[in-house]
Swiss-Prot record:
Name of the protein described by the UniProt record: Zinc finger protein AEBP2
Encoding gene, per UniProt annotation: aebp2
Signal peptide start and end residues: none
Disordered, as annotated region: 1-117, 123-142, 268-304
Record GO terms (molecular function): DNA binding; zinc ion binding
Matching InterPro entries: AEBP2/jing_C2H2-ZnF, Znf_C2H2_sf, Znf_C2H2_type
UniProt feature, compositional bias: Low complexity: 272-281
Length: 415
């Protein structure tokens, strides 16, 4: 029995050493011990039934290798010494059958690579047959799968051990601070918009001196545009910070606004809606009371009649004003009431239209006054002519029968 097993082991160990030079042949030879063990098991278990031996995968051989060889040794010990030669011949025959089955499959799959895989599986089987546990290989597979999982985790956005140890602190802090300050050369980050607004107001707005205030917010439409109003800059920066400090004063309303003007436009909407609701309720009450239906009808007719009456129109429009102004200018050019008469006197200008010499030897001239047809012509001494070139007459002293010729309004005012 011992000699038979030693011959089989020597034959198995000699097969890989004979073909070390050729990769494909070594792979084919290295695969021989595996089917020998497996087929022996299959033969001992399934030979009485008459079934053909089945080929097992390397994983199944790895799992069952240790138990199979233990069972094989126990069966061999139970056999008699007379059957040892028959067992060796049967193993050789099964070995040759397995070679004929495995050669086509290995040629189709590439020979050398399959041989290396066979050799690795044989090493695993030998280690398992020697009694070593397969926990080392399982642990290596689990480590490889763990490394692959950890490499794929950052791409999906989940936290990794490196990130938990502090390598991802920058990204987490960036996500937490969602309100950055975009002022020129300022890189502060804030968690809330009121904090950002307070920072802008205290550092960037109140920090400007000299009476000139500019907005240096990156991307602003009025970037670096000077202004003399600090209050304008404070209101303008609310649009960048997103803060809305002006809250609605009406109870139950949670609306907030970035400017006082927006709040002022919002508040009246509450009262207008209340008034409209009151009016609608009043109309409903009136419609529901039949006793007031006749009164409402009469009121409607009364209002309709009032609307149908012709409305008085004011004809003193812009064109009328222009006409009056033109007439006043022409009157002043003729009478100099405004320019020289101080608004209450008419200035008359004289021209000599005739001359005569009396018996006494005096020379007289006939003066004609303009504006015309107001004062009558008069004879004066030629020596008095220089003093009578102009004559100022108050409007109240004008002749009543000719004063209206200046202007009808003058006549209405003083006569």
């Amino acid at each position: 029995m011992a000699s038979t097993t030693s011959d089989a082991s020597e034959q198995e160990s000699a097969n890989p050493s004979e073909k070390n030079g050729d990769g494909s042949e070594s792979g084919l030879r290295a695969a021989d011990p595996e089917p020998a063990v497996k087929m022996d098991e299959a033969d001992t278990d399934e030979k009485p039934g008459g079934h053909e031996p089945t080929e097992q995968s390397p994983e199944e051989a790895t799992r069952d290798g240790g138990n199979d060889e233990d069972g094989e040794t126990e069966k061999e010990q139970q056999k008699s010494p007379g059957s040892a030669d028959g067992t060796a011949e049967r193993m050789k025959r099964e070995q040759r059958e397995e070679e004929s089955v495995s050669l086509p499959a290995e040629k189709n799959s590439g020979g050398g690579g399959t041989g290396m895989k066979r050799r690795a599986s044989l090493e695993m089987m030998s280690s398992s047959s020697d009694g070593e546990p397969l926990s080392r290989m399982d642990s290596e597979d689990s480590i490889n799968s763990t490394l692959m999982d950890t490499e794929s985790i950052p791409s999906s956005g989940r936290s990794t051990p490196a990130m938990m140890n502090g390598l991802g602190g920058a990204s987490s802090s960036t996500k937490g601070s969602s309100y950055p300050c975009c002022w020129d050369q300022c890189h502060m980050l804030f968690n809330t918009s009121p904090d950002l607004a307070e920072h802008i107001r205290g550092v960037h707005v109140d920090g400007q001196r000299g009476g000139v205030f500019v907005c240096l917010w990156k991307g602003c439409k009025v970037y670096n545009t000077p202004s003399t109003s600090q209050s304008w800059l404070q209101r303008h920066m609310l649009s960048h910070s997103g803060d809305k400090p002006f809250k609605c004063v009406v109870g139950g309303c949670n609306a907030t606004f970035a400017s006082q003007g927006g709040l002022a436009r919002h508040v009246p909407t509450h009262f207008s809606s209340q008034n409209s609701s009151k009016l609608s309720s009043q109309t409903k009450v009136k419609e529901e009371s039949p006793s007031k239906a006749g009164m409402n009808k009469r009121r409607k007719l009364k209002y309709k009649r009032r609307r149908s009456l012709p409305r008085p129109h004011d004809f003193f429009d812009a064109q009328t004003m222009d006409a009056i102004r033109h007439r006043a200018i022409c009157l002043n050019l003729a009478t100099h009431i405004e320019s020289q008469g101080k608004g209450h006197s008419v200035v008359f200008h004289s021209t000599v239209i005739a001359r005569r010499k009396e018996d006494s030897g005096k020379v007289k001239v006939l003066l004609h006054w303009t504006p015309e047809d107001i004062l009558p012509d008069s004879w004066v001494s030629e020596s008095d002519r220089p003093q009578l070139k102009t004559k100022v007459v108050h409007l109240s002293q004008l002749p009543q029968d000719t004063a209206f010729l200046l202007d009808p309004n003058i006549y209405r005012m003083f006569f």
